[in-house]
UniProtKB/Swiss-Prot annotation:
Site feature location: Important for the stereospecificity of catalysis: 117
Binding site for (3S)-3-hydroxybutanoyl-CoA: 76-79, 86-88, 117, 196-198, 235, 240, 245, 284
Lineage start: Bacteria, Pseudomonadati, Pseudomonadota, Betaproteobacteria, Burkholderiales
Stated role: Together with HcmB, catalyzes the isomerization of 2-hydroxyisobutyryl-CoA and 3-hydroxybutyryl-CoA. Is specific for 2-hydroxyisobutyryl-CoA and (S)-3-hydroxybutyryl-CoA, and shows only very low activity with (R)-3-hydroxybutyryl-CoA, isobutyryl-CoA and butyryl-CoA. In vitro, can isomerize pivalyl-CoA and isovaleryl-CoA, with much lower efficiency. Plays a central role in the degradation of substrates bearing a tert-butyl moiety, such as the fuel oxygenate methyl tert-butyl ether (MTBE) and its metabolites.
Disruption phenotype: Insertion mutant cannot grow on 2-hydroxyisobutyric acid (2-HIBA).
SUPFAM superfamilies (UniProt xref): Cobalamin (vitamin B12)-dependent enzymes (SSF51703)
pH dependence statement: Optimum pH is 6.6.
Identification of the protein by name: 2-hydroxyisobutanoyl-CoA mutase large subunit
Length: 562
């Protein structure tokens, strides 16, 4: 069933042609439009106006109702009328104790979920006393080497009452092992713990470039995380398949959406090869997207993603459980849009991006601090960012009605166009040999780089306005702003604890277990998670584990693409 009978559609199209020729034509002689053509950030043409004729061919069942397949209007029947989105401001700097204080501050301000950023050594699997870590310990995230660090990070936080998200990828399974070990040590029922580990390694090869091992063993690690969690962490999201970093690397919103779903397909294929049915693990798959500057395009993107995901899971993978077809996503406002000139304007940018995320049906949200173009956000910036979410939730009324932009001719037309283009890209990926092959060939990387270059040219020419940068520019010789300070004692404090853990552990036991881990890694039918959990309990460091597996897997070196 479609929106309109063909005769009514034809009448509307005729009426619009008449309007263009008469009212529009006459008015343009007096007041020309601002530019010849209008496009979204993602290069979708934008018409002057939209009517029911523009969505006449969209099946009504593709729009549907919230909480009903294909979930275009939202994954749940009551959405924010029952519970508003999780307000999950990210934090991470210094040692576990330092970040723990920020967590507690944000919780006291009304935050409802925890999100953690890690420093570069932790992300790349180096201990804090490794030469490669020099100058980086705790600088751009929290340093985590051992289970003792995880204990400090989450001290006095009830893990059964608040969900914890870890933004980490190549070494994600080790962080998850520490989290599980901590949960067991505290006596929690693991099936009551909720949260997310990002663990999306494929987008690292595409965009963020934080990887350790070659692609095949890295995808195996993701498989092991998902299969272990499906059996042992029933409420935990074992992966956050991320378009955010693809966007921040310079992609279009369409590329962000399509490339993320290409990665999804690869992961689901790998897990189902183990014999696990999609309904056994898909209900806990989660996603992470950006909310960019084009308000209506972002809303349409989120709606189209839900529709595409539902169809992929049902039609391609044979999902029968509706929970396997609901796309749930965390959203973050676009860090790449933040500016140093006139930095307080970032509050307005972030507010609009947050609103589009909410109107697009996000399950959790991080709003960027106004100072994040300079450094890690200060407490004041994070409080302002959190208050932004709270005002949207409590004062604006947008949380009181589900999918209020549903039925908008423009939004519905753009949603359907997004769906069409996403599936076209996915078909092209299949024809070219699949996601992994195209990563190895640099196809995704080149697509992202080309769009990023086009965007840079548009900013440089002024075709893409950026207030304070190429429009309404002020002469600011020195921008004065209080930024988050780096504590120069961080590395010393962190390294001291790591070395203490090494000194107190049973070294022979740890080395024997590391040798066992090599055997498990060589046997792809086995899962790395159980032994990794025992290793961190025994005092093994992240660096111990990562370096041991480099011995059999090696490291990844990207082939440059021009």
């Amino acid at each position: 069933m479609t929106w309109l009978e063909p005769q009514i559609k034809s009448q509307l199209q005729s009426e619009r042609k008449d309007w263009e020729a008469n009212e529009v034509g006459a008015f343009l002689k007096k007041a020309p439009e601002r530019k010849e053509q209008f496009h979204t950030i993602g290069d979708f043409p934008v018409q002057r106006t939209y009517t029911a004729a523009d969505i006449a061919d969209t099946p009504l069942e593709d729009i549907g109702l919230p909480g009903r397949y294909p979930f275009t209007r939202g994954p749940y029947p009551t959405m924010y009328r029952s519970r508003t989105w999780t307000m999950r401001q990210i934090a991470g700097f210094g040692t576990g104790e330092d970040t723990n204080k920020r967590f507690k501050y944000l919780i006291a301000q009304g935050q409802t979920g925890i999100s953690t950023d890690f420093d570069m050594p932790t992300l790349m699997g180096y201990d804090s006393d490794h030469p490669m870590s020099d100058g980086e310990v705790g600088r751009e995230g929290v340093a985590i080497d051992t289970l003792a660090d995880m204990e400090a990070l989450l001290a006095d936080i009830d893990l059964e009452k608040i969900s914890v998200s870890f933004t980490i990828n190549p070494s994600a399974w080790i962080l998850l092992a520490m989290y599980v070990a901590l949960g067991e040590k505290r006596g929690y029922d693991l099936n009551k713990l909720s949260g997310t580990v990002q663990a999306d390694i494929l987008k690292e090869y595409m965009a963020q470039k934080e990887y350790i091992y070659p692609i095949a063993p890295s995808v195996r690690i993701v498989r092991d995380i998902i299969t272990y969690s499906a059996k042992n962490l029933k409420r935990y999201n074992p992966i956050n398949i991320s378009g955010y970093h693809i966007s921040e690397a310079g992609s279009s919103p369409l590329q962000e959406a399509a490339f993320t779903l290409a990665n999804l397909i690869t992961y689901v294929n790998e897990v189902t090869k183990t014999g696990m049915h999609v309904d056994e693990f898909a209900p806990r798959l989660a996603f992470f997207f950006v909310s960019q500057g084009d308000f209506f395009e972002e809303v349409a993107k989120f709606r189209a993603l839900r529709r595409c995901y539902a169809k992929i899971m049902k039609e391609r993978f044979g999902a029968r459980n509706p929970e396997s077809m609901r796309l749930r996503f965390h959203c973050q406002t676009a860090a790449a849009t933040l500016t140093k000139p006139q930095y307080m304007v970032n509050v307005v940018r972030t507010s609009l991006q947050a609103l589009s995320a909410v109107l697009g049906g996000a399950q959790s949200l991080h709003t960027n601090g106004y100072d994040e173009a300079f450094a890690i956000p200060t407490e004041d910036a994070m409080k302002m960012a959190l208050r932004t979410q709270q005002i949207i939730a409590e004062e604006s009324g947008v949380a009181d009605v589900i999918d209020p932009l549903g039925g908008s001719y423009y939004v519905e037309a753009l949603t359907t166009e997004y769906e069409k283009k996403i599936f076209e890209i996915l078909e092209e990926v299949e024809k070219r040999g699949g996601t992994i092959k195209l990563i190895e060939q640099g196809w995704f990387q080149k697509q992202i780089a080309d769009f990023a270059y086009e965007t840079a040219l548009r900013k440089q020419s002024g075709q893409k306005p950026v207030i304070g940068v190429n429009r309404f520019v002020e002469n600011e010789e020195d921008v004065k702003i209080e930024i988050h300070p780096y504590d120069n004692t961080t590395a010393e404090r962190q390294i001291s604890r790591t070395r203490r853990v090494r000194a107190e552990r049973d070294e022979a036991k740890v080395q024997a277990m590391l040798d066992q881990l090599v055997a498990v890694a060589k046997d792809e039918s086995q899962n790395l998670m159980p032994l990794t959990i025992e290793l961190v309990k025994a005092g093994a460091t992240m660096g111990d584990i990562v370096e041991k597996l480099k011995g059999i897997w090696g490291t990844y070196r990207e082939t440059p693409v021009f």
